[in-house]
């Protein structure tokens, strides 16, 4: 009896997994077959505008200048290596 119930639970679980994996995942604006409706695509293109470039306002603050200044990643000062004491090899 217990073996029959285990088999039944496994069959039901398999059926649920198959149903979920094969089902259509719907998203807003999508039609069956993965196609968008033409009306919504046209509305999206109209929202994007004419394709003009948007200019950013000029910032002349010190914070902006600091952010744009290149950083020196490699430190040319190797004096910290000279400070290490080397033990003589015996």
Curated annotation (Swiss-Prot):
Domain of life: Eukaryota
Database matches in Pfam families: GnRH (PF00446)
Primary subcellular site in the record, as a coarse category: secreted
List of residues that carry Glycine amide: 33
Signal peptide segment: 1-23
Positions bearing Pyrrolidone carboxylic acid: 24
Subcellular location: Secreted
Keywords: Amidation, Cleavage on pair of basic residues, Hormone, Pyrrolidone carboxylic acid, Secreted, Signal
PROSITE patterns listed in its UniProt record: GNRH
Entry GO terms, CC: extracellular space
Stretches for region Disordered: 56-90
One of the record's GO molecular function terms: gonadotropin-releasing hormone receptor binding
Family under the similarity heading: Belongs to the GnRH family.
General function of this protein: Stimulates the secretion of gonadotropins.
Protein name as it appears in the record: Progonadoliberin-3
Organism: Dicentrarchus labrax
Gene label: gnrh3
